[in-house]
Amino acid sequence: MDIRRIVLYMALALIGLSLWNAWQIDYPAKQPVEEKTASQLTSDGHLLPQIIPSNAEQPVTLKAEEKASSGKQLIQVKTDVLDVDIDLKNGDIVKGLLLDYPLSVEDKNKPFPLLQNQASQRYVANSSLFVLDGQTPQSLDFDFTSEKEYYELKPDQNQLIVTLNGKSEDGLDVKKEFVFTKGSYLIEVNYKIANTGNSLWKGYFNTQLLRSSPKEDKSSIFHIGSYTGASFSNPGKNRYQKVSFSDMSKSNLDVDAKGGWIAMQQHYFLSAWVPNADSENKFYTLATDKDYTIGAVSQPITVKPKEDKIVGSKLYIGPEITSVLKGISPSLDLTVDYGILWFLSSLLFSLMKAIYTVVGNWGWSIVLVTVLIKLAFYRLSATSYKSMASMRKLQPKLQALRERYGDDKAKISQATMELYKQEKVNPLGGCLPILIQIPVFIALYWVLLESVELRQAPFIFWINDLASADPYHVLPLIMGATMLIQQKLNPAPADPMQAKVMMFLPILFTGLFWNFPSGLVLYWIVNNTLSILQQWYITRKYSDEKPAKKVVATAK
């Protein structure tokens, strides 16, 4: 029995089962979305949290066709990394293009549209002020104006400020300010409120992210999905908490938080509202008419007559880059979902990034990190291979015991243990070194799957995107061949059924890896190749048929 191979494949099966179960938790069967009443929306389509009794009378919602026919006036803002459209109706960001991230390898000239406001796909970032008219939430309609329709951050500018001007019927003079910074995906959004009336103004600041009919990236046996949904952080209580779309359909989130953040996630990219660290907000979610929203509403804001006040938040629209997110808000970097071994994955990614700065290619970085990991575990692996070599030496004696005792399993087991003791062989000696390495393999697996740096990153020859499957499926075939070679280095199992299963495994894993990202398959190829070389060396070194022994035998 080849303990290393059996334990390794059992570990792989266990990993696969664990990943499948984890993704089933993240992506449960879709529940029918409950048709929520219009009491959750204002007349301009903004969703508002239930901060008042749910049976209170609410304004009527505009139908989709009425909103479409009302027309929108947009302004465009372009920086070196962002291209956004702002709707002057409420100052919402309704389009967000990421200029440094092409839509695909084939469409290099088309930037990735993270935010968009299309009939088939609506994903926008809202921010607004609202008041309570009795018990009715009423979003204030400022009908903002702008000096220009197009703003652009010039190469010699470090910052661009876009100001929208508006005024409410009750004498509230508002300037909505967007601050864009060179090279940054973070936008400061501020309301400068001036109460020009004669009475105290009391209202709320509301920020939200809304997606309609989102497509969830679900996992299957031949595809690795990534989390698509909402999340939030409540400092001191929940560092990072996912809220799936199915969770929103079942119940509304209602969390009081100081600081923290709310976000909408998808593979590689993220949008997030980050309130001021000392501000107190209520985080909420709503699902209605196939629209899924996560939002944050402030505590009551009061502005005395002739008084000015500034309220605001920060909006991130961009890639999930760990180092960038870590500098924006605590725990925001956890949206780069490395799983339960995130701390180990972070260390491995730092190592990969350091190598990348030297070699300038993420593919070679994967290769070299795999080599370093194998070197780090060389002695443990050697112990495993030595144990296997010792077990192979005992195979004839073990077979003789089986023939002697036939079907008497108790005597076979007793005699086998006595043989192990006599020969000073630990049958489990090869297991522990492998088990110790498994967490590292899992951590690196998630690094390769979740790191946006590998998206559209070329390697060599035809591999032009390490985050996508090999277009010609050459890498999966090579990986299957390396698994087959590993099997050939081991004696066939005594059990015929086990031998058939082991022969089928390379075919099975080739099929499983057929559409896996090239970076993942590359890692397994390098890992398998190094394992083959080490196993061949150790097995040859500790084989009974050593050159020295052959010389002695000849002399006799």
From Swiss-Prot:
GO terms for cellular component: plasma membrane. PANTHER family: CYTOCHROME C OXIDASE ASSEMBLY PROTEIN COX18, MITOCHONDRIAL, OXA1. It comes from the Bacteria. Its main location: membrane. Required for the insertion and/or proper folding and/or complex formation of integral membrane proteins into the membrane. Involved in integration of membrane proteins that insert both dependently and independently of the Sec translocase complex, as well as at least some lipoproteins. Aids folding of multispanning membrane proteins. It comes from Legionella pneumophila subsp. pneumophila (strain Philadelphia 1 / ATCC 33152 / DSM 7513). NCBIfam families: PRK01318.1-3, yidC_nterm, yidC_oxa1_cterm. InterPro entries: Membr_insert_YidC (IPR019998), Membr_insert_YidC_N (IPR028053), YidC/ALB3/OXA1/COX18 (IPR001708), YidC/Oxa/ALB_C (IPR028055), YidC_ALB_C (IPR047196), YidC_periplasmic_sf (IPR038221). Keywords: Cell inner membrane, Cell membrane, Chaperone, Membrane, Protein transport, Transmembrane, Transmembrane helix, Transport. This is Membrane protein insertase YidC. GO terms for biological process: protein insertion into membrane; protein transport.
